[in-house]
């Protein structure tokens, strides 16, 4: 168990705003204290209204993203309507739980906007599913969560949430050797999503 937790490298944050959701993560890919890449992508759009962000082993993050993206696309074709954020998160929860004996080494959050408004869900490697207003995952989470908690309010806008997410990740990067090398953000609103990348 402790070996697995040590592999939850990096820092990922999610913030639910009144008009959407912001997901963000730094770009460093490391195994222990070995720096493998400075350009890892850990934040992905799944549909035009749902996104995913994760900390952990990059191969597992990429696999989770591909599988959930394909399953949601199939569901939307079969149902002939968009999948809700909650349904997407539950689908991922089932997928993770089915692999509980050989779990993906990744902590994940799913966020987006649907008819019920903005939603943010947090999942561990075994598929536990928690809905929250904000979250931080990975080695830098302890540093990032304090900043987010201090700056968060229920009336926060996506613009303010993006600034808060970037500030929290920058602070985590300053204190966590497994985090660094830039920040990717994904802002999801009723108009779709917008990706951005910040070099540090």
UniProtKB/Swiss-Prot annotation:
Family note: Belongs to the peptidase T1B family.
Active-site residues, Swiss-Prot/TrEMBL: 11
Matching Gene3D superfamilies: Glutamine Phosphoribosylpyrophosphate, subunit 1, domain 1 (3.60.20.10)
Main location: cytoplasm
GO CC term, one of those recorded: proteasome core complex, beta-subunit complex
Listed name of the protein: Proteasome subunit beta 2
One biological process term in Gene Ontology: proteasomal protein catabolic process
Keywords: Autocatalytic cleavage, Cytoplasm, Hydrolase, Protease, Proteasome, Threonine protease, Zymogen
Broad class of enzyme this protein falls into: hydrolase
Organism the protein comes from: Caldivirga maquilingensis (strain ATCC 700844 / DSM 13496 / JCM 10307 / IC-167)
Propeptide: 1-10
Regulation: The formation of the proteasomal ATPase PAN-20S proteasome complex, via the docking of the C-termini of PAN into the intersubunit pockets in the alpha-rings, triggers opening of the gate for substrate entry. Interconversion between the open-gate and close-gate conformations leads to a dynamic regulation of the 20S proteasome proteolysis activity.
Localization terms from the record: Cytoplasm
Entries under NCBIfam families matching the protein: arc_protsome_B (TIGR03634)
Disulfide bonds: none
Function: Component of the proteasome core, a large protease complex with broad specificity involved in protein degradation.
Catalysed transformations (reactions): Cleavage of peptide bonds with very broad specificity
UniProt xrefs under PROSITE patterns: PROTEASOME_BETA_1 (PS00854), PROTEASOME_BETA_2 (PS51476)
EC nos: 3.4.25.1
HAMAP family from the UniProt entry: Proteasome_B_A
Any one GO molecular-function label of the UniProt entry: threonine-type endopeptidase activity
């Amino acid at each position: 168990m402790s070996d697995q937790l040590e592999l939850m490298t990096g820092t990922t944050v999610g913030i639910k705003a009144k008009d959407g959701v912001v997901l963000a993560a730094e770009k460093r890919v490391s195994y222990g204290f070995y720096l493998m890449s400075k350009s890892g992508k850990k934040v992905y759009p799944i549909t035009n209204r749902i996104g995913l962000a994760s900390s952990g082993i990059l191969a597992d993050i990429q696999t989770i993203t591909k599988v959930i993206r394909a399953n949601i696309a199939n569901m939307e074709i079969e149902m002939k309507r968009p999948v809700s954020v909650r349904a997407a998160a539950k689908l991922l929860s089932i997928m993770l739980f089915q692999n509980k004996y050989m779990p993906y080494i990744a902590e994940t959050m799913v966020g987006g906007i649907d008819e019920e408004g903005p939603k943010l869900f947090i999942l561990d490697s075994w598929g536990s599913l928690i809905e929250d207003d904000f979250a931080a995952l990975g080695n830098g989470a302890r540093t990032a969560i304090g900043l987010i908690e201090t700056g968060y309010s229920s009336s926060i806008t996506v613009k303010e949430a993006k600034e808060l997410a970037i500030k929290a990740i920058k602070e985590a990067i300053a204190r966590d050797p497994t985090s660094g090398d830039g920040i990717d953000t994904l802002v999801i609103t009723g108009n779709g999503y917008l990706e951005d990348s910040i070099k540090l």
